[in-house]
Amino acid sequence: MIQLGLVKAKDGAYWLDNPQATRYFWAPNGYNLKSGEGYFQNVWVLFNQAVYGFTDHFSGGVGVMPLFLFGGTATPAWLMAKFSVPVVENKFNLGAGALMGTVIGEDNTGFGILYGISTFGSKDKNLNIGLGWGFAGGEMARNPTVNISGMIRTGAKGYFITENYFIGTSDIFVVITMLGGRSIIRRVGLDYGVVLPFSSDMDGFVAAPWLGLTIPFGEKIN
């Protein structure tokens, strides 16, 4: 049976609510997982993380890059948490969070980021602006990293996604642009796109493919 509270009408057709509305390729936004919902994300086999909604406003997770499986010795691992609230329901959300990690097998390799985010728009069409202060080796970055991301629904099971980072230091300015899409296949998200880094001292053009899979768990739509 269709539950109208969990679907929306579009041009006479019914679309399920966005099942993966809380993040872009990687960056989080001001929407949160519902209590009891979670997901496992894998990117190119190496990048793995799991996130769980402990309440409707707080989520946390763990991540790891198991390089030891591929002959490496050092293994990055991290914890993350996010708190978010709707200021105007389905139109404007605010959030804040942190990621803290280390490289297992190495000394003095603590790293992380503290961030705040503002998300404008609905789960299907939104713009996200974030500021993050990274830290590593006991030192905090002097300048914040700016993140501008967006998502637009293109169909019943498709989304266009962009995720962009602006990183400035006293020596260099870097922009990382990610463009691509997401297809929902039985509530599993298939992310695909291209990563385009630019910097003030680059001479050539670099493009790297992005391919990820996100598998939900916990609460489901019936």
Short names for language-model regions:
Residues 130:
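Glycine/small-residue-rich phosphate/adenosyl-binding loop
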Residues 147-150:
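Solenoidal tandem-repeat scaffolds enriched in leucines and small polar residues
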Residues 1-3:
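A short macromolecule-binding patch
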Residues 139-145:
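A general structural motif
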Residues 6-114, 119-123, 134-136, 154-222:
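Transmembrane beta-barrel domains of Gram-negative outer membranes and organellar outer membranes
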